[in-house]
Amino acid sequence: MFRFFVIKKWLLWSWIGSFVILTSLWVQVKIDVEINKWFGEFYDMIQKALSKPNSITIEEYWESLFSFISLAGLYVSVYVIISFFTAHFLFRWRAAMVEWYHSVYERASKIEGAAQRVQEDTIKFSRIMESLGTSLIESIMVLIQFIPILLGLSVGIPIFFFGDWQYGLISGALIWTLGGTIFLIALGWILRLVGVEYDLQKKEAAYRKVLVLGEDNLEKTNPTIVNNLYDGVRKIHYKMYFHYLYFNAAKWSYLQGMVIVPYIALAPTIITGAVTLGFVQQISRAFGRVESSLQYLVRSWPIIVELISVRRRLLEFERQIEINDNR
C-alpha cells in the first residue's frame, strides 16, 4: 500500500506532493488564527456600537466586514486549490498500488475477491485518505496554533472549577474530550464495529462473486446458494445497524454536550462581566477549535473503522499473493 513512497517513478509526486499539501494546510490554519482574532475585534466593535450609539463610524463597520471577506476569500482559494491537488495526489497513490496489483494479477486472480481488492478497495482507500488524512494533519496543526492562543487568553480570568489557574481551559478541554474519546473507543471495541465492518465486506464479496460467475454461466448461479448468501448479507447489515444505533446515540449525545462546555467553563467570568463580548467570542471559538481537533477520533470513527477494514483486506490480499508466489 505504501510503495508509492519508495518507487522511483512516484517519488516526485509522493514526497514533493506531501510537502505541498502540508504547507497549504499550515497556511489554512494560520488564516484561521487570523479569522479568530477578527471575531474578537468585530464583536468588541458590535458591543461598543450597541452600548453607545454612534460610537463607531459606518466606514469602520464596512472596513471590518471587508477584512473578513478578504480573509475568507483567501481561505476558500487555498482550500479549493489544495483539494484539487490532493485529489490528484491520492489518485497517483492509488495508481501506484494498482500498477503493482496489475503486474501480479495473473497469480492474484485466483484469490477470492481479487477484482474487488484491486478496483473497489483501492479507490476506497484513496477517497478515505483524502478526507481522513488531511483532517488528521489539520487537527494536529490546529492544536499547535490554538493551544498557545487559548493559554494566552485564559490568563487572569476565573474558570469554573479550576479558578484562576492558567491551564484551566486547556485542562477542561482535555478532560472532557479525551474522556469522551476513550469512552467511545471502548464502546466501539465492545460493539466490535471494525469486526462487523470486515465481516460485512466478506459477505458482500462472496455474494458478488456468485452473481458475477452467473453472468457467464447461469448454471453456476444456484438460486438456493444465492438466496443463502443474500440472507447472510442481510443479517450482517442488520447487525451493523443495531451496533451503530448504540454508538451513534452515545456519540451525538456527547458531541451536543460539547456545545455548552466553553460557556460552562467561562461562567464565573461572564457572570462578573470581567470580559467583553468580543473576548468571549474569541476564547469560545479558540476553545471550540481545540475541542474539535481533540475530538478527531470521535468525529471520524465510522470512517476510521472503514479504513481499518480496507487496510486489513488489502494486507490479507497481498499476503495471499506472497503465499501463492512461494508455492
Model-derived regions, located:
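Short cytosolic helices in intracellular loops of multi-pass membrane proteins
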Residues: 94-111, 189-232, 291-298, 307-319
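Juxtamembrane helix-loop junctions of ABC transporter transmembrane domains
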Residues: 31-40, 44-47, 71-110, 130, ...
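Membrane-integrated ABC transporters
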Residues: 1-35, 41-68, 82, 86, ...
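Hydrophobic alpha-helical transmembrane segments of multi-pass integral membrane proteins
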Residues: 15-31, 35, 66-78, 135-151, ...
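Transmembrane-helix motif of ABC transporter permease domains
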Residues: 7-31, 51-92, 162-186, 277-291
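Hydrophobic alpha-helical transmembrane segments of ABC transporter permease domains
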Residues: 122-171, 258
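An intracellular "coupling" helix at the cytosolic face of ABC transporter transmembrane type-1 domains
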Residues: 124, 200-207, 211-257, 261, ...
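Helix-loop-helix
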Residues: 152-178, 243-311
